[in-house]
Regions:
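Conserved class I S-adenosyl-L-methionine
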Residues: 1-37, 53-54, 122-149
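Class I SAM-dependent methyltransferase SAM/SAH-binding core
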Residues: 45-84
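A short acidic, Gly/Pro-enriched loop at the edge of an enzyme's catalytic core
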Residues: 82-92
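A short SAM/SAH-binding and catalytic strip from SAM-dependent methyltransferases
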Residues: 90-105
Length: 240
């Protein structure tokens, strides 16, 4: 199922989870810039942005939000492969959405079109054959309101990238989700993935079996993603 179809139905539930527990995925967002830190006054395109959650991690920069699905906000809706209503930006961020993109090569090429020369793409997503991919496709897919979750996962070292993009980093990084309790973790996942007709224990068992977590002073879910940094080496035409 496409990103547009999924979040047209599940966007409100996802946004509720992100806004009720806004700290849970701090590590996931912070890891985006761990290898190439942000400067000041950079223009950053967050796509797909859904509820615009990136802005609080980029307080000295301007974040432009676009999305692929009309759901919970007034953010402009665009195609992954078409012209976007923005001037070339310094950086583009795509977090945890690439596994819903059908033509990754075209998407990368389009992102390159919207970068300044030497601009950076920061992409992070679930790895091929990882425990998290199995959690999403098997448990979430069996219990979400949209009826399935069949992600397009990749070994990012084997992906064909446009020749105008230089691979700077490809790295699996831990980005644990942090909760106050098991109950909070189950509630968060219930809304984030719009899980229906499942009890907290079923969610916790699935998280334990697929992903793993520790429950001591904090409840820490062992989330991790592959982080990819790409740099545009496409020469921009000189101004006339």
């Amino acid at each position: 199922m496409s990103y547009e179809s999924i979040f047209r139905h599940r966007g409100e539930s996802y946004d509720f989870a992100m806004k009720k527990f806004p700290w849970v995925r701090d590590k996931e967002f912070q890891q985006l810039f761990s290898k190439i830190p942000l400067g000041k006054n950079e223009m950053i395109l967050d796509i797909p942005a859904l509820g615009g959650y990136l802005q609080k991690y980029c307080i000295e920069n301007t974040v432009i939000c676009l999305d692929f699905s009309k759901s919970i906000n007034g953010i402009d809706v665009v195609s992954p492969y078409g012209k976007w209503p923005v001037k070339p930006v310094d950086r583009i961020v795509c977090l945890a959405a690439a596994h819903h993109i059908d033509d990754l090569y075209l998407f990368f090429n389009n992102m390159c079109d919207h970068l300044i020369e030497n601009g950076i793409i920061h992409l992070a997503d679930v790895a091929l054959d990882s425990p998290i991919s199995k959690f999403l496709d098997e448990f979430v897919g069996s219990n979400t309101s949209t009826g399935s979750h069949n992600g397009n996962y990749y070994d990012w070292n084997d992906v064909k990238y446009p020749t105008d993009l230089k691979v700077v980093n490809i790295e699996n990084r831990p980005c644990p989700w942090i909760f106050e309790s098991e109950h909070q973790m189950a509630e968060y996942c219930r809304f984030l993935f719009d899980l229906k007709n499942v009890k907290d224990k079923q969610i916790l068992d699935a998280l334990s079996n697929f992903v793993g977590y520790k429950n001591k002073e904090k409840c820490i879910l062992n989330w991790n993603l592959t982080y990819i940094d790409l740099q545009s080496i496409r020469a921009k035409p000189a101004s006339s």
